[in-house]
Amino acid sequence: MLESHYYKDMVEAGCDEAGRGCLAGSVYAAAVILPPGYQNAELNDSKKLTDKKRKALREQIERDAVAWAVGVVTPEEIDKINILNASFLAMHRALDQLKVRPEAVIVDGNRFKPYKDLPYTTIVKGDGKYLSIAAASILAKTYRDDYMDALAEEYPQYDWKANKGYPTKKHRAAIREFGVTPYHRMSYNLLGTGELSIDFKD
């Protein structure tokens, strides 16, 4: 069972992001405040759960949470400010939207940009240690997956329904064959060969 809270007797928001390593699409982050003493044995790192389980847990998290929100940073913004800063910005946007103001923040990973004047703690593999971070990882992942599934309808050739924008062989082969879309992150090594961009034929 994951820990319910890191900070004792404080309103604490857990944060996590999804899509940092993707070649295409926005980066998503979620912030979740769970009730004091909350318990849920099924909550865990979203990467360890099936898609069906994540979707079911998303509904439960949204019902049970004191507050929750999702923040999004676009590929254009990622290219301007880099993916690390974009991840921080997505988390800040999620925190901005919370209907209850947290008194502290816990974040998956080892880096975070301070949010307002709130105390914060970064926790490596936090999505497998704290319930609110696990909940945030599930919301960020499922909302981003839904977004990539919608983009896949528009651009089916990139196999985004399966790869969600991550750098698979099929995704990179499609970039070579069809070029890039407005959703690709141009600052990334899209072809995996040291080449960032592609020459389009007239």
Feature locations, PLM:
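RNase H-like, Mg2+-dependent phosphodiesterase core
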Residues: 1-202
